């Protein structure tokens, strides 16, 4: 029995957003290390600006800090080139045991294959691996959004999480990273 339908009209912005969420979800440790190294190099360089080495350290540190999202942007650019500027509209139908991506190549996915449920303010991401996710627009679910999210938690045994952010980084985030991710499977 069909339970829900959802869709997304992709654009370059949605591709960039998905790549960033992927990075923030699965590569956040690398991002934190890059930020800490960048900060350390910038501070060290600022104390020694009178020397060439200090200037180089400061420049490299600043470059690391401003390029935290470079891997995601680079991946998004590669996807844009592969799509030749033709962004798809993906429609989904959710059933009791699986969902179907209605596209040129129809894809049937059992809920057991989903490894992580992630949400941000506008989209839901159903990750089947660290490199692949199905993205859908929350607005396309309308008033059914909360029921859909509860259904997905029950169907997958997972909890919805938000992507990690440097601005909300805390001890809880560190503990989740050490354990290898956030609340992947409900207990």
Sequence positions of predicted segments:
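N-terminal membrane-targeting/pre-transmembrane regions
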Residues: 1-41
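Residue-level signal for tight coil/turn positions that link beta-strands
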Residues: 10-12, 96, 121
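Alpha-helical transmembrane spans
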Residues: 24-84
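Conserved beta-hairpin
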Residues: 68-108
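Generic beta-strand structural signal
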Residues: 93-94, 118-119, 128
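Phosphoinositide-dependent membrane-docking surfaces
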Residues: 99-100, 107-124
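A membrane-cytosol interface segment of integral membrane proteins
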Residues: 125-187
């Amino acid at each position: 029995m069909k339970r829900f339908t959802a869709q997304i009209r992709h654009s370059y912005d949605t591709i960039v957003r998905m790549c960033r969420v992927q990075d923030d979800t699965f590569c956040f440790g690398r991002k934190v290390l890059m930020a800490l190294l960048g900060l350390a190099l910038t501070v060290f360089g600022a104390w020694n600006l009178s020397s060439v080495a200090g200037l180089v350290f400061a420049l490299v540190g600043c470059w690391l800090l401003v390029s935290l999202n470079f891997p995601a942007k680079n991946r998004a650019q590669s996807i844009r080139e592969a799509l030749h500027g033709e962004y798809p509209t993906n429609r989904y139908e959710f059933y009791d045991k699986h969902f179907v991506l209605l596209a040129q190549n129809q894809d049937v996915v059992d809920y057991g294959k989903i490894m992580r449920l992630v949400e941000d303010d506008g989209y839901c991401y159903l990750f089947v691996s660290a490199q692949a996710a199905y993205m859908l627009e929350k607005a396309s679910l309308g008033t059914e959004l909360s029921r859909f999210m509860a259904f997905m938690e029950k169907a997958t045994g997972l909890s919805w999480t938000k992507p990690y952010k440097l601005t909300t980084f805390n001890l809880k985030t560190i503990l989740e990273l050490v354990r290898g991710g956030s609340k992947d499977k409900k207990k």
